[in-house]
Amino acid sequence: MRSRLWLGLAWLLLARAPGAPGGYPHLEGDVRWRRLFSSTHFFLRVDLGGRVQGTRWRHGQDSIVEIRSVRVGTVVIKAVYSGFYVAMNRRGRLYGSRVYSVDCRFRERIEENGYNTYASRRWRHRGRPMFLALDSQGIPRQGRRTRRHQLSTHFLPVLVSS
């Protein structure tokens, strides 16, 4: 009798009515075209060779990225011009990937100062998240040397103007 009660309770908690939305569907599948402007004054770009770096040129086609929400708080960043996904390997190095993989997923968080940070969903270094970051010369910083409070990890998603 007791096991049937628990089974019924579990079914009530886990089951959804047919057609009922699950989670936050308005936040999933959202697609935004933006330029990611770093607080170090560089736009994130992915060139035709798949190299991730920063550029100061605000009108470059290779700095337009598509930020797609795949889950609540999880995004995929894809360069529109080159078609490469921004990805991070286990050593914390940023690279452009032709195909989508779990290395391409980032946790997007809006910080208190209004900037966004992007931490790898897959990789951590000694229990700490590894962040997307551009240093003061526009060179990607190794993820294991980054922290949330560092300015090099802060990005503003800027609207793409015609």
UniProtKB/Swiss-Prot annotation:
Q: What is its main location?
A: secreted
**Membrane-spanning ranges:** none
Q: Does the keyword Signal apply?
A: yes
Q: Which keywords does this Swiss-Prot/TrEMBL entry list? A: Growth factor, Secreted, Signal
GO biological process, any? regulation of synapse maturation
Q: Does the keyword Thylakoid apply?
A: no
The record's listing under Gene3D superfamilies reads:
2.80.10.50
Q: Where is the signal peptide?
A: 1-22
Q: Which InterPro entries match?
A: Fibroblast_GF_fam (IPR002209), IL1/FGF (IPR008996)
Mind listing the GO molecular function terms for this protein? growth factor activity
Annotated localization: Secreted
Q: Which GO terms describe its cellular component?
A: cell surface; extrinsic component of postsynaptic density membrane; GABA-ergic synapse; glutamatergic synapse; Golgi apparatus; nucleolus; postsynapse
Going by the entry's taxonomy, the superkingdom of the source organism is recorded as Eukaryota
Organs and tissues of expression = Preferentially expressed in skin; low expression in brain. Expressed in the inner root sheath of the hair follicle.
Q: Which family does it belong to?
A: Belongs to the heparin-binding growth factors family.
Q: Outline the subunit composition.
A: Interacts with FGFR1 and FGFR2. Interacts with FGFBP1.
Q: What does this protein do?
A: Plays a role in the fasting response, glucose homeostasis, lipolysis and lipogenesis. Can stimulate cell proliferation (in vitro). May be involved in hair development.
Q: What is this protein called?
A: Fibroblast growth factor 22
This chain's source organism reads Mus musculus (Mouse)
Gene name on record? Fgf22
